[in-house]
Amino acid sequence: MASPASMAARRVLSAASHAGHEGGSARTWKILSFVLALPGVAVCIANAYMKMQQHSHEPPEFVAYSHLRIRTKKWPWGDGNHSLFHNPHENALPEGYEGPRH
């Protein structure tokens, strides 16, 4: 069986032999980040921007479905018809959308 001193020396030497691999790996990932990841993010941003430009800004036609926007009792805040996080540009009331939409 090997002595503890020889085991420690063997560990130090084996660790030193692998020291050169770490720098190459970091360099590889750095290159991959600049060559693949950044252009990929740029393509995704361009795609999202083009989709946003094509998006229709007209509101959908309001249809008063009987199973939606049921009010059995008033909300305890405001006029009782608007939910706590009501957004007049996105959320319809039982009567329809509020005012002009953009």
Swiss-Prot record:
Transmembrane annotation, as ranges: 26-50
Principal subcellular localization: mitochondrion
Localization, UniProt: Mitochondrion inner membrane
Organelle targeting peptide span: 1-13
Cellular-component GO terms for this entry: mitochondrial inner membrane
Family membership noted in the UniProt record: Belongs to the cytochrome c oxidase subunit 6A family.
Subunit record text: Component of the cytochrome c oxidase (complex IV, CIV), a multisubunit enzyme composed of 14 subunits. The complex is composed of a catalytic core of 3 subunits MT-CO1, MT-CO2 and MT-CO3, encoded in the mitochondrial DNA, and 11 supernumerary subunits COX4I, COX5A, COX5B, COX6A, COX6B, COX6C, COX7A, COX7B, COX7C, COX8 and NDUFA4, which are encoded in the nuclear genome.
Free-text function comment from the UniProt entry: Component of the cytochrome c oxidase, the last enzyme in the mitochondrial electron transport chain which drives oxidative phosphorylation. The respiratory chain contains 3 multisubunit complexes succinate dehydrogenase (complex II, CII), ubiquinol-cytochrome c oxidoreductase (cytochrome b-c1 complex, complex III, CIII) and cytochrome c oxidase (complex IV, CIV), that cooperate to transfer electrons derived from NADH and succinate to molecular oxygen, creating an electrochemical gradient over the inner membrane that drives transmembrane transport and the ATP synthase.
Full protein name: Cytochrome c oxidase subunit 6A, mitochondrial
Organism this protein belongs to: Oncorhynchus mykiss
